[in-house]
């Protein structure tokens, strides 16, 4: 390399290699929590359950993507297991404000990819949506009290991203 100048040989400049801990480019649906329907964690969980990443990866991404379980995937900040040490110390005073599962089971996205898995995920999603005040009427999800259809808008920075939202049609 070009790092063979006198200061290197005299050890006044140290060469050190750093591992790449780049999480790369993440693509995700970010829900606007200022919208009342997305303030309910059951609705957010149901939308995640209804998203069959494995099928989308196979049919649109040619199997090239890997689904990640942490916003900070590939870095030392990534969620990987149950909280411990300083992370647990930080979370402990918030225990009554975060889901109990944060302390009992590592976060994992739901798995689809097979008819049985997708069906089970959709059943659970519908159950959660029912608890949150929605029901199926015919083939449309509506608010139980008002009959208002469950609708939301997906915004993307590029028209080619529209196909990622097709599972929600």
PLM region descriptions:
Residues 1-169:
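Extracytoplasmic/periplasmic ligand-capture domains
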